[in-house]
Amino acid sequence: MKRTLMQVYIKGSAEAVGVYQRAFNAPLVAGYKNDDGTYMHAEIDVDGQILAVSEEFQSGNAGNKMQFCLHYKNDEKDKVTKAYNVLIEGAQKIYDPLGPCSYSPHMAAFVDKFGIFWCIFSD
């Protein structure tokens, strides 16, 4: 296998790519746009892991059947905090605000404004 990646289909892909780049300090490594400026396919590098974003052209329920879980090392709590602060802007639902839980001293779970369910935490 050459690689695996996380792929999401959402409305507002161009805005989402910018938000996710800010949240994770992630460079755009591939981007193919549709005529309307949305992304047919975009890839950003989130600490060596690829997050792919494409425009959703059919209605769906993104965020309610799967979750992106990003597990950071103990010395990367600042990355968790930064991502949380960017991604909760306009969030649809915050399940667990940033704080301690049974498996992490620094965790948050929420659905962002694009309908993506995230769990981000550190050791």
Language-model features: locations:
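N-terminal beta-strand motif that seeds the catalytic metal site of vicinal oxygen chelate
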Residues: M1-G18, P27-Y32, Q67-L70, K93, ...
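Short solvent-exposed loop/turn micro-motifs enriched in small/polar/acidic residues
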Residues: M1, D35-G37, C101-Y103
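Short loop/turn microsegments at loop-to-beta-strand junctions
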Residues: T4, Y39-M40, P105-M107
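Terminal peptide-recognition signature
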Residues: M6, Y20, I44, L87, ...
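Conserved short beta-strand elements that form part of the metal-binding/catalytic scaffold
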Residues: G31-K65, W118-F121
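Short, flexible helix/strand-to-coil boundary loops that buttress conserved ligand/catalytic motifs
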Residues: Q21, E55, Y84
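Vicinal oxygen chelate
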Residues: I10-A14, F68-K113
